[in-house]
Every structure is written in structure tokens, then in C-alpha cells.
Design a protein with these regions (language model features):
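Conserved ABC ATPase "signature" region
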Residues: 133-151, 203
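Hydrophobic anchor residue at the start of the ABC signature
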Residues: 169
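The feature captures the beta-strand-to-loop junction immediately N-terminal to the Walker
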Residues: 64-66
């Protein structure tokens, strides 16, 4: 079992002093001149074009950009759920050519099976061939990590949205992925639960330091959670395709103070890059 438990009210993101910080175990992700186009009745539409970025092993990279710019498509390409029409994607130096077991994804909706308990839903994420005893131990470990031990035998309809999302996160981690892909995982939650889930993600990453790629519409969330922030931009209004505009390094070490001047300055910089007045709220 892990040497810490997480409750919904825990606001700390630091490991206890007597627990060693684990080394990053995530895989580096390299995207080289990646493009993704779709064909339809209106002709060909490029969503991503000439996208080149290196995601470091064990880092949290947040992806922000205007609605419809291809953020979710980027996640699907990294995870092998969607094939690029140009370029190449590798995880830990090996090409991604199909649905890739080295990656796991969690969506905005928990997508839990309603007739199974939370523990049984988490169990579905275990790699094939996992022994019964090892599987039970891993599920118990993950439920403790996300603060759901006491709710393990409840069904999804019996728990809150935040608890269901924690179970979804645990299920994604059950595979032991080198890369964890998060597609606006907290977007449907209320403001307070969202803040708690942000802290929980940092706690989980401290214990299981896989590479994380997080898509979010919330600039403040991106800066609070990520090591770096990838800003996508639309290349041309005519075709709407997107590529990398900038990659920014988040200020200071985590946990970050949202009230610090450096945090506020970078938030304003990102919002300006997105074409948003800096006096507006951060969620886009």
C-alpha cells in the first residue's frame, strides 16, 4: 500500500518527509511534424498541421487553445486512438501505430459501468494477465491513493461526480501507463470539487510520476498543475488547422500560489495569446 491516504479535503500536495520522491517512470513523447486531416462532404479539413513537440518523461504538460483547435485530437493521436495523416509519434522512442497499451486516457465524463462497483470499475483497467491477488492489491492501493477506500463497494450512481472522476482516474492508472492522457477531466465539476481534484492530481503524480498530458480550457488550472503549457494556435482562418504557437514554463515549484505576480503575469500572457481580454475570467 502507498504510504499516504488522500481525502477530499486534503489540500497538501507534498509527500511526507519520510517518503522518498519516486523517480519519473513515464515515457517521453515525441511528435514530429504531425498532421491530422479529416475528409467530409465539404472536402478535406486539416485539424492539426506540422505539429512538433517533445514531451519530457515524467512531466505534466497542459494543452490549451481555442475551442475546436484540435486539443482532443492531439490526445487521441498520442494514445493511438487516431492515426495522424502526416508525421510520426513515439512514446519512449517506440512508434505509436495503433491503440497503445503504454498510454491510458480519462475523459471529462467518468464513463464508469453503472452496474459495477467502483472497485470493479478500477479493476477493468488492470493489464491483461494480472493475477487475482496482485490485481486486488493494486486496486486497493489505487482506491486508497484517490481517497475511495470507504466507497469501494458503491456503484457509480451512489457517489458524487467528483468521486466518480476519482474512480476514473484510478482506472486509468491501473494499467501502469507510461503516459496518462487527461481530456478536460475536471471540466464538468463544480468549482470547489474542481480545486480539490487539481490537488488530488498533483498528489497522485507525486506518488505515481508518469508523464501526463492534460487538455484544459482553464488557463489558471494549466498553470497551477503543469510543468509546461502548450498553446495551440489556428494557422489560417480559411482551413482552421492548428499547430504549436508557444510552449511556456510554469512559474516556480509546485504547489504554486495563484496570487503570486509571476503566476498572474503568465496567466495574462496566455490569455492574450488566446485572444482573450486579461480582465476576463480564466476558464475559456
Amino acid at each position: 500500500m502507498v504510504g499516504m491516504s488522500v481525502t477530499a479535503l486534503d489540500r497538501s500536495v507534498a509527500l511526507p518527509a519520510d517518503v522518498d520522491q519516486p523517480a519519473p517512470r513515464g515515457g517521453a513523447v515525441d511528435l514530429v511534424e504531425v498532421g491530422r486531416a479529416f475528409s467530409g462532404t465539404g472536402g478535406r479539413r486539416d485539424v492539426l498541421r506540422d505539429l512538433t513537440v517533445q514531451i519530457r518523461a515524467g512531466e505534466i504538460l497542459a494543452v490549451v487553445g481555442p475551442s475546436g483547435c484540435g486539443k482532443s485530437t492531439l490526445l487521441r493521436v498520442i494514445g493511438g486512438l487516431d492515426r495522424p495523416t502526416a508525421g510520426a509519434v513515439t512514446v519512449a522512442g517506440q512508434p505509436v501505430v495503433d491503440t497503445d497499451a503504454r498510454t491510458a486516457i480519462a475523459f471529462q465524463e467518468p464513463r464508469l459501468l453503472p452496474w459495477r462497483t467502483l472497485a470493479q470499475n478500477v479493476e477493468l483497467g488492470l493489464p491483461q494477465g494480472t493475477g487475482r491477488r496482485a490485481g486486488r492489491a493494486r486496486v486497493a492501493e489505487l482506491l486508497e491513493l484517490v481517497g475511495l477506500t470507504a466507497s469501494a463497494d458503491l456503484n457509480p450512481r451512489q457517489v458524487s461526480g467528483g468521486m466518480a472522476q476519482r474512480a476514473s482516474l484510478a482506472r486509468a492508472l491501473a494499467r501502469g501507463p507510461e503516459v496518462l492522457l487527461l481530456d478536460e477531466p475536471f471540466g464538468a465539476l463544480d468549482a470547489l470539487t474542481r480545486l480539490r481534484m487539481q490537488d488530488l492530481l498533483l498528489q497522485v503524480h507525486a506518488v505515481e510520476p508518469t508523464t501526463v498530458v492534460l487538455v484544459t480550457h482553464d488557463v489558471e488550472e494549466a498553470l497551477f498543475l503543469a510543468d509546461r503549457v502548450l498553446l495551440l494556435r489556428t494557422l489560417t482562418p480559411e482551413d482552421g488547422s492548428s499547430s504549436v504557437a508557444r510552449i511556456l514554463t510554469a512559474p516556480g515549484e509546485r504547489p504554486r500560489d495563484r496570487a503570486e505576480a509571476a503566476f498572474a503575469d503568465l496567466r495574462a500572457d496566455l490569455l492574450t495569446g488566446l485572444g482573450v481580454d486579461t480582465h476576463h475570467a480564466s476558464p475559456l
